[in-house]
Design a protein with these regions (language model features):
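P-loop NTPase motor domains
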Residues: 36-49, 56-258, 274, 324-327, ...
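P-loop NTPase motor core of the ASCE superfamily
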Residues: 73-128, 274-392
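Conserved nucleotide-binding/hydrolysis micro-motifs of P-loop NTPases
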Residues: 32-35, 59-61, 195-197, 234-235, ...
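Structural recognition of the conserved hydrophobic beta-strand(s) that form the central parallel beta-sheet
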Residues: 26-29, 229, 253, 259-265
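Hydrophobic/aromatic beta-strand patches that form the interior of the parallel beta-sheet core
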Residues: 27-29, 52-54, 189-191, 261, ...
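Glycine-rich phosphate-binding loop of nucleotide-binding enzymes
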Residues: 1-56
């Protein structure tokens, strides 16, 4: 956590690069092109074999199939994640999900899965699930001896709301992909979804789609560290309806030798959200904070929320207070579950600086020169770094 200008993107680039070099599979969900330079470097280094940059656009949206599996095996967690996705499609952030709604949708998912297992001619997809709900589950509800009131579970309202994700609807591409996002063979993947961060319908759905793709990768990739980093996109998951999904994700990540990292700059987002406290902070043993001077007057709330000791508070408030003026670096505090903590300096070479920078003028210069050199970003960075050293 660090406010704008604290060196957060820089530190994260540095951290991620080291994870990657140690063999970790990294998946990033970003909303600001912070990792474009590093991703491009990896793509050049591997001759296009790695370093994949997905940018969400209307022409090339990110899509997947929540009902697809290689082997028709759906464990309890997979079924729960499908149910959570469907509730997200149906309900707005402020709508409270009742036990009946959650229970009925869970039962419908179960029954649909049994059907596609029994009849392999049915193509598992959101389209066929929607048809099952509309044609079969709705009829079965009406025929029950104990009636389910519309006020408890309004299936017509659900079908109407979800219609836009069904065949010929405006978002019919999202959940009916014939090709699934294949993350298995690539070790460094960035999903850039800045273009939809203001879209309250698409943003949470696409974020869940990416996280589901990551979880599918984790289940299949044994004995290798996997890392999911969610930048400001985590806000899409901070509604009360998402709490269960976040808990499920953290539990699953740990089980499969993975790490989930949430990156934020707005302290108010964290302080004001009980979901963040219950689902993210309580499941995070490692906490990393950058310069917090901007939030001095709110630091008691931060300390309470993160469960920091007085010693840890003093360490954090000392960040960048006595930096060596002859060196270029920014400090960062790392705390490990209350057992160990210290302040470190993020100090990088001129080459690393140019690969990590999010400064618009510097990025433009790097990419302009790369175009002239046939896309060789590494050669450009070496040239510019050498030029800077000569100036010094």
């Amino acid at each position: 956590m660090g406010p704008s200008g604290s060196g957060k993107s820089f530190f994260m680039n540095h951290l991620v690069r080291q994870y990657y070099e140690q063999g970790t599979h990294v998946v990033l969900v970003d909303t600001g092109n912070s990792y474009q330079g590093l991703c491009e470097m990896i793509r050049c280094k591997t001759n296009g074999a790695d370093g994949v940059y997905f940018t969400y656009t209307e022409e090339k949206p990110i899509s997947f199939n929540p009902f697809y599996t290689d082997d028709y095996v759906f464990d309890v967690e997979k079924k729960d994640s499908i149910k959570t996705l469907l509730l997200t499609l149906w309900k707005s952030e402020d709508d409270k999900v009742t036990k009946t709604e959650s229970g009925e949708l869970g039962s419908a998912v179960n029954a649909y899965i049994e059907r596609i297992r029994a009849d392999r001619s049915i193509v598992p997809s959101f389209n066929t699930f929607y048809e099952y709900m509309r044609d079969d589950y709705r009829r079965e509800l009406a025929e029950r001896e104990i009636k389910v009131e519309k006020s408890d579970f309004n299936i017509d309202n659900m079908l109407t709301t979800m219609r836009q994700y069904y065949r010929d609807g405006r978002y019919d591409f999202l959940l009916n992909s014939t090709e699934n996002i294949d993350l298995l063979g690539k070790r460094f993947i960035v999903f850039e979804i800045d273009s939809i961060k203001e879209n309250r319908e698409l943003f949470p759905v696409v974020t869940i789609i990416i996280m589901e793709a990551f979880i599918n990768k984790m289940r299949r990739l044994k004995g290798v560290r996997k890392q999911l980093i969610v930048e400001e996109a985590w806000k899409a998951l901070s509604s009360a309806n998402m709490a269960e999904y976040l808990r499920y994700m953290y539990k699953t990540v740990r089980k499969y030798y993975g790490e989930a990292i949430v990156v934020t700059q707005e302290v108010d987002d964290i302080i004001s959200s009980p979901v963040v406290k219950e689902s993210i902070i309580n499941n995070s043993d490692c906490k990393i904070l950058l310069d917090q001077r901007k939030y001095m007057n709110k630091f008691d709330a931060i300390q309470s929320l993160l469960g920091l000791t007085e010693k840890e508070k003093s360490q954090i408030l000392s960040i960048n207070m006595a930096n060596n003026p002859s060196r270029l670096y920014k400090e960062v505090w790392i705390g490990l579950g209350g057992t160990q903590s210290a302040v470190y300096a993020t100090e990088v070479s001129a080459e690393e600086y140019l690969a990590y920078t999010t400064e618009e003028t510097e990025k433009v210069e790097v990419y302009r020169l790369a175009e002239q050199l046939g896309g060789d970003i590494e050669a450009v960075i070496r040239q510019l770094a050498e030029r800077r050293r000569k100036k010094e």
